[in-house]
Amino acid sequence: MSKIFKISFLLFLIFSFTTFKSLSITDALIGTVGNKPLLHSDLINEMKMLLILSGKNFSQENKKELQKVALKSITGRLIKEIEIEKYKFNNFNQNDVDYEINKITEKLNIDLGTLKGSFKTNDINFSTLENRIKTELKWNGLMFNLYKNRVIVN
């Protein structure tokens, strides 16, 4: 791991979670994945979204694990976005996005309004979740298109 990334990540850990709303530090670049920036706000929002989607609350005990999972999640998604852009693949079905959101609400046993309210309460734009789902759908479609002729089903 590069020294800059280690220092940036250490600074992030020091300043994280004192408070989400009153933290007076402006957004900072944590690192990059390819040509895509990874910002402090992206990591915080990913952690919040993971907590919302898992139905869990933040605690100091799960902080480090949550940060690791969030960083891995963002990194994977950025890699997928790079490949999607590389192959100029933008096919997805909006009905599939709606279906995935419905699965989330059913899993959490809440309605769509409550889910959107949770995002608003945590200062996360709901379109972030929609874009995350779209990226997964595009990625799955891209992988299918690239490898459909190589798969043999008996």
Predicted segments, located by residue:
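Short, low-structural-confidence N-terminal segments
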Residues: M1-K72, T121, F144
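Peptidyl-prolyl cis-trans isomerase
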Residues: L38, E61-N154
